[in-house]
């Protein structure tokens, strides 16, 4: 594949839900975030060092016991546009505090959380209650610090939810909570607040992958099951997938993620297309923006675009593809 854009790209073969072979082209464009505390309408600078789309998931620790750091991009489609955020919730001005707020807004996507210093469940007159939070300067925006625990379908690596009251004594509470639905009991089931990708093996996402049973082995393997749901390819936390898709130009506000104040800007407007040549035909596809990764600590944002070109049993006649940026479009 010939890449004439300013960004990094990869291509790979896959099958779609109907079992048709497709050539997938994915482009990752990395840009520099503006300074905190200074809203800007100026275009973001393209980073000098571009990184290819990550081929596989990467985790903060062991995959079975930690949350994803990066979502792998070897998928043929993604409904809507995912927004992922990695970084920290900061105390205002970087001065230690016991409680703060953090939030992100990208177009119509929005996520907010109350941030606490470290707390544990402690015995009280009427049962267990949260201890007084200790002061903090910054808190990682990881699922491990949100509500959940072993057996929780939405967040099995989280904390604060336990099998029994006795099992919760002196055990940690979440440091990231829904401000409108805080955890009030160690056996309560609440919806966790997250900013990073949801792991594909967590029950809430795995349920969309379809049924892999004896019938599938006999009639479909290695294709996707008949009950496969393409929403399985969505990895964004609830509230951070734009169902109608983002197109570029949307306003972005990051609050509480930098000690110097809000980070405010607009997503870059980039239009990409791929032209794939076969011996007897040519296919042209526009790449769709289906991922935005805000790496606040690194001062960068990565946009991910994707297109799937039908192969139509012509793989032996495939001659190559060219990725271009379309100039002059609004």
Task: Locate each region found by the language model.
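Extended intrinsically disordered or low-complexity segments
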Residues: 2-330
């Amino acid at each position: 594949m010939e890449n004439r854009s300013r960004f990094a790209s990869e291509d790979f073969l896959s099958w779609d839900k109907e079992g048709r072979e497709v050539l997938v082209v994915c482009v990752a464009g990395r840009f520099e975030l503006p300074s905190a505390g200074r809203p800007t309408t100026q275009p973001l600078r393209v980073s000098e060092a571009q990184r290819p789309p990550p081929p596989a998931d990467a985790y903060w620790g062991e995959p079975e016991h930690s949350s994803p750091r990066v979502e792998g991009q070897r998928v043929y489609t993604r409904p809507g546009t995912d927004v992922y955020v990695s970084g920290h919730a900061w105390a205002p001005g970087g001065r230690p505090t016991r409680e703060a707020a953090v939030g992100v807004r990208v177009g119509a996507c929005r996520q907010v959380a109350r941030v606490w210093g470290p707390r544990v469940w402690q015995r009280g007159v009427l049962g267990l209650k949260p201890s007084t939070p200790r002061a903090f300067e910054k808190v990682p925006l990881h699922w491990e610090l949100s509500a959940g625990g072993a057996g929780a379908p939405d967040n099995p690596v989280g904390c604060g939810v336990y099998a029994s009251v006795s099992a919760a004594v002196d055990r940690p509470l979440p440091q990231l909570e829904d401000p409108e639905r805080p955890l009030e009991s160690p056996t309560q089931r609440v919806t966790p607040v997250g900013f990073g990708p949801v792991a594909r093996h967590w029950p809430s996402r795995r349920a969309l992958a379809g049924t892999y049973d004896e019938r599938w082995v006999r009639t479909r393997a290695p294709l996707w099951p008949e009950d496969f749901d393409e929403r399985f390819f969505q990895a964004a936390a609830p509230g951070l997938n734009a169902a109608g898709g983002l197109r570029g130009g949307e306003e972005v506000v990051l609050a509480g993620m930098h000690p110097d104040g809000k980070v405010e800007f607009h997503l870059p407007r980039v239009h990409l297309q791929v032209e794939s040549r076969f011996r007897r035909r040519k296919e042209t596809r526009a790449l769709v923006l289906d991922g935005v990764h805000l790496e606040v600590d690194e001062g960068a944002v990565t946009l991910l675009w994707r297109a799937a070109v039908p192969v139509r049993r012509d793989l032996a006649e495939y001659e190559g593809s060219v990725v271009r940026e379309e100039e002059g479009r609004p």
